[in-house]
Amino acid sequence: MIKYFKIVLLIVVGSWLTACHSKSKTKSTSGEKPKTETNVSSSKMKNVADLLGVKESEIKNEDLYKFIAAWYGTPYKYGGCDIKGTDCSCLTINLYQKVFKKNLPRTADEMMKMCDKLSSSKVEEGDMVFFKIESKQVTHVGVYLKNDKFIHASTKKGVMISDLNEPYFKKYFYTFGRLK
């Protein structure tokens, strides 16, 4: 009886794992270029500047803002790590790899442990913003931009720019951090 149960369990678990990992592959026939940091239109860059409340001419780190323009609107996907779907820590990992040529660990809490904490008067563009959302550990991370704005991956709206002065972010804000 136990042997029969183990065989049935193995078959059920095996088919469940196969079903969870199957992907349908479709190709775009629209002729559009895939979203990348290198083919960002100037109108998207202007939109990012507008969201930050700055003029395009005030954008100095062009690689950073090209990355933001390309990834803006990417859907949230827990465990996702590419432009088709990402979570907050992987957005930050990709941004740091592509813009700053730095490697980061996979979780927001591990990232925070690699940083020196900063006061709001010391924070600069590219520093990380950490949140403890109903937890004792850091559970959310974003990257500081300008004018109290930061980029992050929202579970509901995907990759977006938010304001640190919004009540939700004020409530859960933990600290700013700069890589040691």
Protein language model features and the residues they cover:
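Bacterial signal peptide processing site
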Residues: 21-24
